[in-house]
Amino acid sequence: MSMEPRKKRNSILKVRQAVETIEETVMNSGPSSTTTNRRVSFHNVKHVKQYDRDHGKILDATPVKEKITDTIGSDGILTPRGGNMDISESPACTSSFQVFGGGNLDKTMDMSLETTINENNETARLFETTRDPTLLYEKIVETTTKVTERIVSMPLDDTLAMFNTTNQEDKDMSVDRSVLFTIPKVPKHNATMNRTIPMDLDESKAAGGQCDETMNVFNFTNLEAAEMDTSKLDENNTMNAIRIPINSNVMPVDMDITEHHTLIEEKKNDTFGPSQLMDISAPQVQVNDTLAIFNSPRDICNKGLGVPQNLINIASNVVPVDMDITDQAVLNAEKKNDQFETSQLMDISIPKVLVNDTMAMFNSPKHVSKSSMDLEKTIEAADKSTKYPSIADEVEDLDMDMDITEQQPCEAGNQQNDGLQLQKEDLMDISVIRDSPAVNDTMAVFQSPARVKIGANNSIIDSQKSIVFGDEMSIDETQNDGTLTLPKSNVEVTTTNDVYTSLERQEENASENVSMINESSVHSEIDKKSFMLIEEERAFMHSSMIDVAQKLEDDGSSKTPVILASQSASLATKEPSALHNSSATLNNSMELDNNTLLKTMQITTCEDISMVHESIAVELNSNKEQEQFGDETLQKNDTSNTGANFTFQGHNETSQIMNNVDSEAVNTSKISTYSAFNLSINQSISKRRRSLLNSARESPRRVALENSIMSMNGQTMEALTEYRQNKTMQTSQDSMPSMSLNDSGRDILAMNTSVRSPHLNSSKTAAPGTPSLMSQNVQLPPPSPQFEMPDFDPAVVNVVYLTSEDPSTEQHPEALKFQRIVENEKMKVQHEIDSLNSTNQLSAEKIDMLKTKELLKFSHDEREAIMIARKDAEIKFLELRLKFALEKKIESDQEIAELEQGNSKMAEQLRGLDKMAVVQKELEKLRSLPPSREESGKIRKEWMEMKQWEFDQKMKALRNVRSNMIALRSEKNALEMKVAEEHEKFAQRNDLKKSRMLVFSKAVKKIVNF
């Protein structure tokens, strides 16, 4: 009875063990580790966490939730009672917020604070630096920041204004006064993120009228709240040249951007500000002017800066225009506006403010803002009698400025004489730039041009003019079929003098018309300079990017390359393909018909390819050819009503033309033309070359196997021979001397030639199998001879036989050893074959076919088995060769080590030989001249010293020997004394033994006698 209370007491004091569930969890990212499910209890809810004991942290997965209805013990361990377990598994994959996820902003981020965190949600893993998890709690901190900055008013000198900051209003960070800024679902666009994203910005303003500054930390610099209502003018307008937006009496504009939505405003405003005509496809934010020195003047214009208000005065009966630039919106604007003043619509894309160009040398080519282009599109819809040029918002392939000048429709009688005469009203600067708000375009020439998918409802139809170089290389130029058309008359090829004349006429007309626009305006001089620059750029672009027409000579003996250009822009017209995820390439696969193929640039090969660029200068065609080209142009372009004159004089003459114009315009045009042209061309060429080289690259193993199979069957190697010939032809073409290179250092005529091109050796006009003109003129080497494949082909197994070049010499010993090993292996294989033949597993016919190497007589499975066996034999041979090579390597390493050791010893022995020449010279000097008394005395003294040193050394050695001999002699004497003592002791023991034996014998005799 006394033991029961003790047992009960022991059971009470017994330490309970925690229930642990150990399981093996295999991690995808690393080696397997043991995890333990630990039970953590908060508010009567037990969570089972997986704890990684190897790495010392709790995993994010929480697969089980248990609701506990009973009380938990004081020791923290739940007693096994009836409980309710709620098993809720997280979904397999949740959409997480990916900042760099290709611009897919339509995904939502899981911001719940539940303890069930999906292991796929990696948002909080960036801050996980501790081993043990901590409790999560919410902390709301309201902070109000007030930032006030002062700007020095400098109305005349804006040099230091670029280094100042903008006027920032008071920031109210309170939650109750913030503006709810909702980001709707944005459709997927190009992954390059270089296009404007249509966004529906729904704003609900509270008291204060300021934008929420919460997201400003993700912007570029300190930003000012963009006020959409610009009706209230500021008192200080000193920084209007730099600030955004332009302060004017403008009513609010709806930011809803749709495709077929016409905005109807109830309010009517007297004036129509320039900001209402701008493209506000993305909310323009005000950038800190500290970084303004890195922007070009055109970049400032891109942001909507510097448009004088006195140049834009539109009639008072104008209604607000929808921001959607579509045909419907333009037609609505055209219906509402009955009359426009032509003098008020000129040169809107050029900045009218004095911007400091201190850092202009570091800027990229000037760009005109997309907003100015949209303004010009709106102006274009007003004048029904005049057709202004219109280009698509985004050029697919060429990221450059394309300033296109159109002529005013003239009468039929004056069309030939005044072909290039332009009027002031007709000059429209249409520039195509990439839509990147507030971004410096200095590095734009190094970026790859990206395509934009044009909507089905868009009225702009892109057509591509294809110029094909040598069966393969094509250059696509994007034009607008809707408004930009070729003339009905014949295409005229003008000379350099005509270009100079047209330029002088343009300058005179421009200067006369500029003087008519607001003579009292402050910006009149700037307008004149701007128009001159625009006209010069247009002349340069017309001389650089036009159609080439040259006579195709029929004489077969002529070695001059002939270039045949397309006569119209619509010959190679094609619908824009699916460009949503397409790469930036200038060449798209398309089937060319006979007419298009004949009208593309075809280059015939000459013996000296350096003559190509010298003959590229276009000759004047005959009147008959012009009439033929004109007829084709009339058939292809029925809607054209304007005349155009094009000229092409090559790069050198174009540069000569531009020598008389402003240097800034020349440099800008060259950079914008050639940098973007070479960038897009070279990128597409390099990409095509990589793909072609990858497809043309064949492994030597496959070539040798195919070669051996063909030789076994007694057939010819047509495919391999043609491949080698084409490869040799490509090598010879690449090695041809070419002195005509473009600015990028590449040969334009040879940079896209590939023997694996689908157009090579195939022409629409020639019979199938007929080689091209280029391949006919190339000298090809003779085909390689047929050869029998040995049992172990060196091309297959990459064996380099150690054979000497001279057959009369003996072979290397390594080669002999290796041949013996190979012979032994062959004997083993032959023994296996004989054993198989003895068992009759193979028929005699198949054995004969194997011996004669007639593989085609076998079935497909049997051929596969033979090839597998052959590969196994090759692998076995490679293993044998590797073993032999390793053994020889070890032996050679040992020999090398021995030789190095011997060389080191020889080097030590010959170390003083380098001084023998000096010693020899000294001896000859002593022998030639008799020594003086002093020198002889010195020599005698040195000799005596040397003798004394030698005597001392000998005496020292003798003393050492004597001392050693004395020591040895003393040791010898001691040993002799010790030996004598031992002998004496031994003799005494013998005597004692003999005496004892004598006594013992006497005693024995006495006993016997008794």
Curated annotation (Swiss-Prot):
The keyword Metal-binding does not apply. Keywords: Cell cycle, Cell division, Centromere, Chromosome, Chromosome partition, Coiled coil, Cytoplasm, Kinetochore, Meiosis, Mitosis, Repeat. Transmembrane segments: none annotated. It is found in: Cytoplasm, Cell cortex; Chromosome, Centromere, Kinetochore. It comes from the Eukaryota. Sequence repeats lie at residues 85-88, 109-112, 228-231, 255-258, 278-281, 323-326, 346-349, 402-405, 428-431. Signal peptide: none annotated. Acts as a component of the outer kinetochore KNL1 complex that serves as a docking point for spindle assembly checkpoint components and mediates microtubule-kinetochore interactions. Kinetochores, consisting of a centromere-associated inner segment and a microtubule-contacting outer segment, play a crucial role in chromosome segregation by mediating the physical connection between centromeric DNA and spindle microtubules. The N-terminus contains a number of repeats which contribute additively to bub-1 recruitment to unattached kinetochores. The repeats are not required for localization to kinetochores. This is Outer kinetochore KNL1 complex subunit knl-1. It comes from Caenorhabditis elegans.
